[in-house]
From Swiss-Prot:
Organism, scientific name: Arabidopsis thaliana
Intervals holding LRR repeats: 498-523, 552-571, 572-595, 597-618, 620-641, 642-665, 806-830, 1090-1114, 1118-1139, 1238-1262, 1264-1286, 1310-1336
Residue ranges annotated for the NB-ARC domain, each copy included: 152-454
Compositional bias per record (Polar residues), positions renumbered to this chain: 912-927, 934-972
Keyword match Transport: no
Pfam families the record matches: LRR_R13L1-DRL21, NB-ARC, Rx_N, WH_DRP
Keywords: ATP-binding, Leucine-rich repeat, Nucleotide-binding, Plant defense, Repeat
Protein name: Putative disease resistance protein At3g14460
Keyword Plastid (UniProt): no
Region described as Disordered: 911-977, 1050-1070
Positions of ATP binding: 200-207
Molecular function per GO: adenylate cyclase activity; ADP binding; ATP binding
Primary role: Potential disease resistance protein.
Domain comment (free text): The LRR repeats probably act as specificity determinant of pathogen recognition.
Length: 1424
């Protein structure tokens, strides 16, 4: 399957020979000229048969051997041409540095070097190529020509990823189920977040589904904090914990030890409900998982961790409460997916019938794998001819057992240059996230972007190549900005297959023999010792790439000695890419100067103290990465000789100055930092010659500019390609003295005036500027492209620039203006009082740390100020007391802390100082998405109201009193929500500023309760809380002229009616009746519904007594029905629930008669998820047999419920129930005689059922049962005969006073039991565990509230070899001998055990290390 891109190689080499005058000049000698011609002839002769060789290599051994040989010869020929080009480049550098005499001497030396060094190599390569050319006829290769030009470039214009996000094919039920799991209120994991595992084979769509669910509006509203982390194969607790913390805080975390990180993360998440997704999780280490979970113990109940993984073992290790198994798609779903990506927006009915017939056969061949369907669709997209589809189908039929042939079809359709670029990506480890710049620089270094006769930048060519590969589904983009990407594992396998031996990725210390033909080598630092890895490749003499990757456990710098490096680099003179990043090297080896072909050198995060001058002889060098070299303070003086240098990264490196002559680096495209020296070094004028600079340029130490005229010489105004500019002064000493407007300050103003950039600039930042005012250009409307401005630490400024006239400005941050007192009209209009609309695009405005600011004067405008403002943040402005700005948009989120600002000057309404708990870190402010309020004590108070369990969609509102998302005023909340829990906040907030005609976003998750919205409109209101779409200009506030509803990505506005009649679909446009989701609140009549309705949510409709009569017949697509707090609703229409339902959720509907409405003759064959909570007061007997497909059943707080009924003769295969939960049912007495006929039941929870006397009979027969939780069932005394099911993995018995663990339970025989928790109710036990009680498999043991427990029985742990985690809680009489009673453990937690706490208080941390207990936690204090 390899070697599909050689024609690109040949074409490029022939073009180089034809077009490079320098090569011709170098090879003027008779022998070298002849060799160059022979090389060209061999390439031209071999090129036409390469495609034929590709096709036959997979089936004919001789052809495959020939192809491998000529590929190696081609690469050696590339090396020869590169050496010749390097010699020409060297001559050019010497010529520029010397005179005519030097030029003649240089020319003679160059020819001599060619004759002695290069010609012998050239002769060898030419003979090798000619040898392979002679065998073309022998093995029967022929010219290969396509009948037409492939249309891949045209197809790439309409990219699959451009389809509407969130639109699923064949996964609607999966999405609903997973959303319901996340919204459920699961109390199973006491003191820990619940874990949900999404399991499936590679390519089945785990990540895609989880990402869509992660962004679902209900999930976003439900969780206060959401985090997404790509875990990868080499899971590391420290790295992932750090990544989680950085994701939350949106700022760098410098802590370098795990316990401190965990404490910091625990504090950050304390009292918050969070959702964490660990994507592509591989780790099967129990100890790592236990250690990772430590930081989440203080989070709010209902927090969730979601794992996507391909291994069920991983789910067991993580103690997943719910394992969601991803299934393959049906053939119909595969066809829908293929047609969508192959035909774009064309409806299926419009597709050519012949194409459709062939396409459906192809869909069958995809075997239900979405990745395969999408990849093949990308290939078919460029082939509208049925003959092409038939050829694909015919070729496909023999590959039904493997995905790689499916993926290779797309690969075969790529042009040669893209094939070679894709193949190089096989050096990336699976799961490696790479950014656009990283990949393009690597392609450039291997010379894969060369286009003869093209004037385009190499970087632009590379970006196009990357975009085409993304469009063809070879890469998956991780963000909408197209900057981060990942390759699916199957695509990684494909890259490895097509690259063959020429790319080698080492992933462990079992070093195989690396083929001599290998050109590109990578390895994982965590799995491979560097010295071993480097020594293993010395025999690969033609190696071009050495690239180590930072897997999670390798973030700390590693040791690498010159003893290892020198022989390696001496042997590999053909290297183009070399990365030594993060290694603890202090000096570069001299052998580095022999790497004349090197184009990419990464020395970032090393400990080098200087960059030797010989580095400047590497004239091919294009990329030099020196970021975070903390000991490097200068660059070599001869750096100007690197005339091919295109990127110089100096971020985080403390350079004192730039060396003189840097202006000669005219190829430089990106320079991260230009440092101005105090007495020497390059001046600002040298920037003038660097006309191609792009990206963001930082100019540091501007206080060292001696004359303002130097700034003008920088020529920033003539740099149109710069996106961002940072101008930074450094303030020496204590800072400033108020009123000290001296000459220095004036000079700085003049310098800043001269540094006017090009109008195309997008982001601009000024730091520590000490001028008294800003130049006029800053704020000029001609800067139409600026979207972000940050002004920081401008201590002597007494006014702000007129940035209100920047038409595209979206983000403005003004920080630490220590003497500024007034923000006036000039801030909006400038000195000329321009009447252009100020701040017409501004979305975020932040003021921070301005101690003397006391007055804010805003203009009075007809349309209000800041028309697009989404967030206003004012922090640490203690003098600002006067009038709050009027006319803000109604949806603006306002954050105020450490500021006594009054809403109306002299009025009673004000924002009180109680809002000071808002995070004060400047870095964290822009990421805030809601207002956070705290109770007077600063501790959030959670509401104990009932919410959903796994498998059910919950009410959209959340009842955390300390958060709000609503567009209604507080006074408009329904009376039942204005409870004493909320009253405590009214005294703190007062009321909103009176000038807000429609109040800003403020409330605490009372979303959706807007009582003054016309009730007639309610049937067509939006998904919860009516949160405005930022892309839609329509208003959604009460009293406005339009309201919004969401139709799965389609936004529409509905006229606000004034009549009291219910609205019918006929009153609206056709597209509005296509609504799929509808939520209604606070209505008394619900008439007709949208015809295509799939989900109906009825909430808090006290006056609603009935549902639409035609609900059961007229809405065949209705799959989800949620009824919450409808206290007057008594029955379903037609005497039974709709039979089309898959999810039915009923809560707080006491009068609803559920059982009487069920018809014994009717099977509710579609219902899969059923939740009944605090409802149906007449529910006594639940007819389980009427629900054959029910997968999840939860009955909560149903006082009358007593038992289940099973229809006589029901077969064991009839009921599909997988999850059963019964809580707070005080009259539940028994289960059906003979037990539960639920062979698929995997999870069962019984909680607070005071009269329940026994578990189901034949419990042992429930062989699918994996987890069993028995909580607060005081009358259960024994376990049914036969004991527990054999496959049980998790057993929790809590507060069941009469259930005492005994050998008779047969726990010892449970070979799969991993997690055992016994909590309370064991008054007679003084020693635990009894010998022979515990199974060998138990991994985690928790014992709690054993009131009389005095000792641990060492013999009871004798056979428990797997146990790693033990938790002991609430055992006040327990005493143990640390070194004798405890089994070998990885994790030990002790809490509320007074005697044990005293014992361990005397033990040093080192003692635990001696005992081999890596993690010990005692009453929250960590010892490790």
């Amino acid at each position: 399957m390899a070697n599909s891109y050689l024609s690109s190689c040949a074409n490029v080499m022939v073009e180089r020979i034809n077009t490079s005058q320098e090569l011709v000049e170098l090879c003027k000698g008779k022998s070298s000229s002849a060799l160059l011609k022979r090389l060209k002839v061999a390439l031209v002769t071999a090129n036409p048969v390469l495609a034929d060789a590709d096709q036959r290599a997979e089936h004919v051994r001789e052809v495959k051997h020939w192809l491998t040989g000529i590929k190696d010869a081609f690469f050696q020929a590339e090396d020869i041409l590169d050496e010749l080009q390097t010699e020409a480049l060297r001559r050019r550098v010497v010529a520029e540095a010397g005179g005519l005499g030097g030029l003649f001497q240089n020319l003679m030396a160059g020819r001599e070097a060619i004759q002695k060094k290069i010609e012998p190599k050239m002769e060898k390569v030419v003979r090798l190529l000619e040898h392979h050319v002679k065998h073309i006829e022998v093995i029967g290769l022929k010219e290969y020509s396509e009948t037409r030009e492939p249309q891949w470039r045209q197809a790439s214009r309409s990219r699959p990823d451009d389809l509407p996000q969130g639109r699923l094919v064949g996964r609607v039920e999966d999405k609903l189920a997973l959303v319901n799991l996340l919204l459920s209120d699961d109390e199973i994991s006491i003191g820990k977040p619940a874990v949900i595992s999404v399991v499936g084979m590679p390519g089945v769509g785990k990540t895609t589904l989880t990402e869509i669910v992660f962004n679902d509006y209900r999930v976003t509203e439900h969780f206060e904090v959401k985090m997404w982390i790509s875990a990868g194969i080499n899971f590391n607790v420290f790295t992932v914990t750090k990544a989680v913390l950085q994701d939350i805080t949106s700022s760098a975390v410098n802590t370098e030890d795990l316990p401190s990180l965990q404490i910091q993360l625990k504090k950050t998440l304390s009292g918050k409900r969070f959702l964490l997704v660990l994507d592509d999780f591989w780790s099967e280490s129990d100890s790592e998982w236990e250690s990772f979970q430590v930081a989440f113990t203080d989070a709010e109940e209902g927090s969730k961790i979601v794992l996507t993984t391909r291994s069920e073992i991983v789910s067991t290790v993580a103690k997943a409460e719910k394992i969601y198994q991803m299934k393959l798609m049906t053939n119909e779903e595969c066809w829908e997916l293929i047609s969508r990506f192959a035909f774009g927006n064309i409806s299926v009915g419009s597709i050519n019938q012949e194409l459709e017939g062939i396409g459906k056969r192809i869909a069958e061949q995809c075997k239900g794998l979405p990745l395969a369907a999408r990849a093949i669709a990308s290939h078919l997209r460029s082939k509208p001819n049925p003959d092409d589809w038939y050829a694909v189908s015919k070729n496909f039929s023999s590959y039904t057992n493997s995905i790689l042939p499916v993926l290779k079809l797309s690969y075969d359709s790529l042009p040669p240059q893209l094939k070679r670029c894709f193949a190089l990506c096989s050096i990336f480890p699976k799961g490696h996230v790479f950014d656009r710049e990283e990949l393009v620089l690597l392609w450039m270094a291997i010379d894969l972007l060369y286009q003869p006769r093209s004037s385009r930048r190499l970087e632009d060519i590379g970006n196009d190549y990357l975009g085409d590969l993304v469009a063809q589904s070879f890469f998956q983009r991780l963000d909408i900005t197209m900057t981060s990407f990942v390759m699916h594992d199957l695509m990684n396998d494909l890259a490895k297959a097509v690259s063959g031996d020429f790319c080698f990725r080492l992933e462990d210390d079992n070093i195989p023999e690396i083929p001599s033909t290998t050109r590109h080598f990578s390895f994982s630092r965590s799995q491979c010792d560097a010295s071993v890895a480097f020594r293993s490749i010395c025999g690969a003499e033609f190696l071009r790439t050495i690239l180590p990757f930072n897997s999670p456990t390798s973030l700390e710098s590693l040791q690498l000695t010159e003893k290892v490096l020198n022989p390696l680099l001496n042997a590999l003179s053909g290297l183009r890419i070399l990365s030594l990043s993060h290694y603890q090297i202090t000096n570069l080896p001299k052998s580095l100067k022999g790497l004349k072909l090197l184009r990419y050198l990464d020395l970032s995060s090393t400990k080098i103290k200087e960059l030797p001058e010989f580095v400047c002889t590497l004239c091919n060098l294009q990329t030099l990465l020196l970021s975070n070299c903390r000991d490097l303070t200068s660059l070599p003086k001869s750096i100007a000789e690197l005339i091919n240098l295109r990127l110089l990264d100096l971020v985080g490196t403390p350079l004192v100055e730039m060396p003189p002559g840097i202006k000669k680096l005219r190829s430089l495209q990106k320079l991260s930092n230009f440092v101005i020296g105090r007495l020497s070094g390059a001046g600002l004028h040298e920037l003038k010659e660097l006309s191609h600079l792009r990206g963001t340029l930082r100019i540091s130490e501007l206080q060292n500019v001696a004359f303002a005229s130097e700034a003008k010489d920088a020529g920033l105004k003539r740099k149109p390609f710069l996106d961002g500019l940072i101008l930074k002064w450094t303030v020496k000493g204590s800072g400033f003295v108020p009123g000290s407007f001296n000459a220095l300050a004036c000079d700085q103003k003049e310098v800043l005036r001269m540094l006017e950039p090009h109008p195309h600039l997008k982001t601009f930042c000024i730091e520590s500027y000490q001028g008294g005012a800003f130049p006029k250009w800053l704020g000029d409307s001609s800067f139409f492209g600026i979207t972000s401005v940050t002004l920081s630490s401008c201590n002597l400024c007494i006014s702000l620039p007129p940035v209100g006239q920047l038409p595209s400005l979206k983000y403005l941050s003004i920080e630490k203006f220590n003497i500024l007192q007034k923000v006036g009209l000039d801030f909006f209009f400038g000195e000329n009082n321009s009447r252009g609309v100020p701040f017409q695009s501004l979305q975020i405005l932040k003021f921070y740390g301005m101690p003397r600011w006391d007055e804010w004067i805003c203009p009075e405008l007809e349309d209000g100020i800041f028309p697009c403002l989404q967030k206003l943040i004012i922090q640490r402005c203690p003098s600002l007391r006067k009038k709050f700005p009027e006319g803000l948009p109604s949806s603006t989120e306002v954050t105020i802390s450490d500021c006594p600002l009054r809403a109306v000057s002299g009025g009673e309404n004000s924002f009180r100082r109680s809002l000071t708990n808002i995070p004060e870190s400047p870095a964290s402010i822009p990421s805030m998405s809601r207002r956070e309020l705290s109770s007077p004590t600063g501790n959030p108070k959670s509401d104990a109201s009932t919410s959903a369990q796994p498998g059910f969609a919950s009410s959209s509102q959340s009842n955390d009193d300390n958060e709000v998302t609503s567009t209604s005023s507080l006074s408009s909340l329904p009376k039942d929500r204005q409870t004493e829990d909320f009253d405590q906040y009214e005294t703190q907030l007062g009321s909103l500023p009176q000038q807000f005609e429609e109040p800003a976003v403020i409330s605490a998750r009372y979303s959706g309760y807007i009582s003054d919205i016309p009730s007639t409109l309610s049937p067509y209101m939006s998904r919860t809380s009516l949160v405005p779409d930022p892309k839609n200009e329509g208003s959604i506030l009460p009293g406005s002229s339009s309201y919004q509803y969401h139709q799965y990505g389609i936004k529409s506005s509905v006229p606000s009616p004034r009549s009291s009649e219910a609205i019918k679909p006929s009153q609206y446009d056709d597209d509005e009746t296509d609504m799929e989701y509808l939520k209604v609140t606070d209505i008394s009549h619900l008439m007709e519904l949208p015809q295509n309705l799939q989900s109906l949510h009825i909430d808090s409709c006290d006056g609603l007594t009935s549902l639409p009569e035609n609900l059961t017949e007229s809405y065949p697509n209705l799959h989800e029905l949620l009824i919450i707090a409808c206290h007057s609703l008594e029955s379903f229409p037609g005497s039974h629930p709709p039979t089309t339902l898959k999810t039915l959720y009923i809560r707080d509907c006491k009068k609803l008669n559920f059982t009487e409405s069920l018809q014994p003759t009717r099977s509710y064959s579609q219902l899969e998820y059923l939740f009944i909570g605090s409802s149906c007061s007449n529910l006594v007997n639940f007819p389980l047999s009427l629900f054959p497909k029910l997968r999840s059943l939860s009955i909560r707080d149903c006082e009358s419920f007593k038992t289940f009924s099973i229809h006589a003769g029901l077969g064991d295969d009839r009921i599909a129930l997988e999850s059963l939960e019964i809580r707070d049912c005080p009259n539940l007495e028994t289960f059906p005689q003979g037990g539960l006929p639920t062979p698929k039941l995997s999870s069962m929870l019984l909680s607070n059922c005071k009269k329940l006397q026994a578990l189901p009979e034949k419990l042992f027969g429930l062989t699918s049962l994996l987890s069993l939780f028995i909580i607060k069932c005081p009358e259960i005394e024994t376990i049914p005969g036969g004991g527990f099911p054999s496959n049980l993995r998790t057993l929790c018995i809590s507060l069941c006073d009469k259930l005492t663990p005994r050998i008779e339970w047969g726990l010892r025989d449970l070979e799969n039991l991993r997690n055992l928790e016994i909590d309370g109710g064991n008054e007679d036990i003084e020693s635990f565990p009894e010998e022979g009680l515990l199974p060998k498999s138990v991994f985690s043991l928790r014992i709690s509230r054993f009131e009389n427990l005095k000792t641990l029985n060492r013999k009871g742990f004798h056979d428990t070899k797997a146990i790693e985690t033990m938790e002991i809680s609430g055992c006040d009489k327990l005493q143990i001998s640390i070194d004798e009673d405890l089994p070998p453990l990885s994790c030990l937690r002790i809490s509320s055990c007074s005697l044990l706490t005293e014992t361990f208080a005397e033990v040093e941390t080192e003692f635990f290390k001696v005992l081999n207990i890596p993690y010990v936690e005692i009453d929250g204090e960590i010892f490790s």
